[in-house]
Amino acid sequence: MTSSDTFLALAPYGRQEVADALSSLPDGKDARSLRHAPYANRLIKLQSAMVPPKVDGTSERVAEIVKGLAEQGAIYPDQMGAIHSDLLNRAYTWNSMGVQESIQALVNDVIHGQNRTLQDELARTKEIANASLLTQFFDSLYKTVDRGQRNFEGFKKLLRLFVNNVPNAEVYGSSGSFSVQINLGGSSQNINLTNAFENLKPIWGARWDAVNNPRIGALLTPNTRALLFFVSSFYDYGAMEPGSYLDNIMRLYKEAIRADVDAEGDAIMELGEAGANLNLRFNDYKDTLNYLLQNREVVPDTAPLELSAEQEMLLKYLMRQLRQALKDGVPADISISTMTQYLDPRLYQTNKVFVEKLQNYLLAAQARNPVYYRLLVLDPNWRPPAGLYTGNYVIPDRYDFEDVQSELEYAGPSRDEYFDDSLFAPGPQRRLNSAEEAQLERDIESLTGHIDEELGVQSQAGWLADHRLPVAFDGALSLTERNAYNTPLPPDSHMRSRSSSVASDLGLLNLSGTGGPGFFASLRPSIGSRQPTGTAVGLRPTTPYSGSGCMRGTGLARKVLNPAASRRGRKLRFY
């Protein structure tokens, strides 16, 4: 085969016909053959002659990519045909080396992503193995304990946090026993988890007692102590039962770890030296570093602290002492410092840390805001905040009344802000219209006329001549000794009948006006009784006798002359 034959074999279909049509005579045989061919065949021949198709399997590659996207769930299966057609059209329209290189780059990216995913999975194999082995270890443990179930479950959660977050900790199992290996600066620490949990089984529910703490501590093996020490780095308040031995020992271990991290301020000095080397101010460098490491503001926990039953009783006793000292006028700092002087020594030794933290908080509250401290002491339901042990106190600042004349202008909230007295307020009073006022005046005039008709009308001088003067001179002219027992009383049946008729008329009268019920009650006459009460001062008889039996007259006159009636402000009307 010659070179020309080889070229013709490799040439695309239709290129030769197009070349013959271009090289032959005008309107020749080759030109007429191409002109009379179907339009689709003629178009395909021209396209193949102008842009020959690639022979590197573009269609197969596009099909593989579309199939892979469908298998990964990136596209729906019913969209494969349309997407494949569009991609082929774009590839054939822009069929060049750039398209082929783009497709190859996409394939390389897919291969690189798969390799990176495999590497990440291999890197997480250790973490997955640790979590799996730790789950197997928990499944092999006892599920319940006699006392301290909350501590048991909380400690398992802390152990899982430790294993998942510490990169140099590895859990492994051997012959039914599980252990954790911790690599520290080239040396390793092996802790047998099975033995540690068996050692802790009788201690889960132990209480923190200053007397029994040495006995409980003697039961802990070095293996168990090491486990408690490492796990305590993830301890937080509320993870275990308050007042228990494990809760206090974990808290003490965590405070020891925190104090040991930067006991001499080495970390702060290193930061300062680094900032100086970078020609930055230390405060700016420290703020930037804190933002990069933390990227959030620390908000102290203000929720009430969970206390044990013993701590609850101790808190109530101490707050009761502070309330009494506040009533007695004892200075707050002295009362807080001496509030434990009458505590039982064993109780104080057991709760020494809690009492000292409480004193620190109360002293800080009293120093920052005495009003807030007084409110805490007087509140019987107050509980210390969760920041009692951490020192992150949230205490409102006291307002300084320097620009006002008196604190009374900005005193505490009034009673109206807490109590709603609207339920007990009297209802709105309805004012009388003109017709009702006229009717009320007519009723009053009718009552007054009826009373005058029943009781009679006299002048003040005539009434005194008929009642007071005879009584005064009767004792002076009498030559016999008189007393309250031998004085005959005049009949008063007519007066009682009149009083009953007046009372019946008063019951039919509506005396309620805008002034409230009983506003016209002073108009009612007072009816005298059958018992003599005596004369007024200065009008007593000259004869020495006790009582007022010598007074004569009707019952109404005796009632008028009664000193008690005068003191009550009752008066008889005169016209």
Swiss-Prot record:
Additional remarks:
All late proteins expressed from the major late promoter are produced by alternative splicing and alternative polyadenylation of the same gene giving rise to non-overlapping ORFs. A leader sequence is present in the N-terminus of all these mRNAs and is recognized by the viral shutoff protein to provide expression although conventional translation via ribosome scanning from the cap has been shut off in the host cell.
| Mod. after translation | Cleaved near the C-terminus by the viral protease during virion maturation to form the mature protein.
Q: What is its main location?
A: virion
Q: Look up the record and report any one GO term of the cellular component aspect.
A: host cell nucleus
Concerning its family, UniProt says: Belongs to the adenoviridae hexon-linking protein IIIa family.
- Translocase keyword on record: no
Chain residue ranges for the region called Disordered: 525-549
- Region ranges (Binding to hexon-linking protein): 129-243
Species for this entry = Fowl adenovirus A serotype 1 (strain CELO / Phelps)
The places in or outside the cell where this protein is found are: Virion; Host nucleus
Q: Identify residues that carry Phosphoserine.
A: S497
Which residues does the propeptide include? 515-575
Quaternary state and interactors: Interacts with hexon proteins; this interaction tethers the peripentonal hexons to hexons situated in the facet. Interacts with the penton protein (via N-terminus). Interacts with packaging protein 3; this interaction is required to promote correct genome packaging.
Site, Cleavage: residue positions: T514, G515
Reported induction: Expressed in the late phase of the viral replicative cycle.
Q: Name one Pfam family in it.
A: Hex_IIIa
Name the job this protein performs.
Structural component of the virion that acts as a cement protein on the capsid exterior which mediates the interactions between the hexons, including the peripentonal hexons, and reaches all the way to the penton vertices. Two hexon linking proteins IIIa, one from each facet, stabilize the unique edge interface between a pair of facets. As the virus enters the host cell, hexon linking proteins IIIa are shed concomitant with virion acidification in the endosome.
Which stretches of sequence are listed as region Peripentonal hexon-tethering domain? 1-95
Q: Which HAMAP family match?
A: ADV_CAP3
Name the keywords, alphabetized.
Answer: Capsid decoration protein, Capsid protein, Host nucleus, Late protein, Phosphoprotein, Viral genome packaging, Viral release from host cell, Virion
State the name under which the record lists this protein. Answer: Pre-hexon-linking protein IIIa
